[in-house]
């Protein structure tokens, strides 16, 4: 089941690159940078996985009201309950791209790489 939750996505390797660029760029002094490559719903991640051969990815997007009811029986879902269905304010990484010359990987590329690594480790089949 794909729960209705959205979050900012960035590859940890891109975060590391941004840190290095910030240390090397004088214009970054005193600045803060949002590094989310984009915001994704869990159902979007499931679709990316499904489209790339990961057949066990969630197939059903659960409505908010169903997820909230299920939260009464699932501790992790209960913790996520306040965030279900909420659209995040879209944080842009434009500042990091402009000042640092930061070029993040696409979220699709990162998701597929992560899934392949998890598969290679034998954690999914």
Name each model feature, range by range:
Residues 18-78, 107-125:
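Mid/C-terminal beta-alpha module of Rossmann-like enzyme folds, strongest
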Residues 5, 35, 57, 86, ...:
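Short, flexible active-site loop motifs that bind/organize anionic cofactors or intermediates
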Residues 71-101:
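Conserved C-terminal active-site "lid" loop/helix of NAD(P)H-dependent oxidoreductases
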Residues 10-13, 40, 105:
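Residue-level signal for the nucleotide or nucleotide-sugar donor/cofactor binding architecture
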Residues 1-10, 14:
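A conserved pocket-lining segment of Rossmann-fold NAD(P)-dependent short-chain dehydrogenase/reductase
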